[in-house]
């Protein structure tokens, strides 16, 4: 599945001129692209991901807004949805942003489309990449539940995600791996399993971080999870402390909650 508008346009949900949560310890101009190849039942941007919120916007218009904000941000960050579905137009945008603003570039992805990532990395340097590791890659059935996929599809997806993570680690200076601690879907033990799997990949990146994130039932979350309570702050913190014992010392360990913001464990 790829969504390819004309090379001079992107299908977007909107943007935010200054964001403090998309790149650790930095301020970003954040752009949301529409559509996703996953159907996570807890997604906070579900209408965007499913294409209900979308508009076709010329790349030049986006660049103009970023140019106005460039003195107030460190990064130009693209998220979704799944941005790599529009990888060709995305590369065009990144190149124009770099040329006209000089900002560092950032991407948020589920890493399930390694061929799209390869195309992006072969055309432009992405300084920061955030990868949402939904569930243990060794457990396709659990990954399927968390990502809203059929198990047979997830069996192939987990291998593609692993490939995408490895590819990204070789093509960026700052890799931020994230997992959302979703009630009734993932336990602290599952997060520890994810951490062991990532640690075993022996990723070589100048800067690498793992972030345990709090689930919050925002307005955009589908009904099934909209009525659930947010993950307790203390559980998120304890889980981050637990996985700090798993990763090698070169990996930064963080947790993110509504109450505390971004907190580094080590």
Residue positions per predicted region:
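Auxiliary Fe-S-binding modules of radical SAM enzymes
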Residues: 1-25, 183-266
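Conserved AdoMet/S-adenosylmethionine-binding subsite of the radical SAM
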Residues: 63-75, 84-221
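A secondary-structure boundary/capping signal
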Residues: 32, 79-80
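Conserved alpha-helical substructure of the radical SAM core
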Residues: 47-77
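Fold-independent oxyanion-binding glycine-rich loops
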Residues: 15, 81, 133
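Short glycine-enriched, charge-decorated loop/helix-capping segments at active-site entrances
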Residues: 47-53, 143-153, 224-230
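Canonical Radical SAM [4Fe-4S] cluster-binding loop centered on the CxxxCxxC motif
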Residues: 4-6, 10, 14-18, 23-57
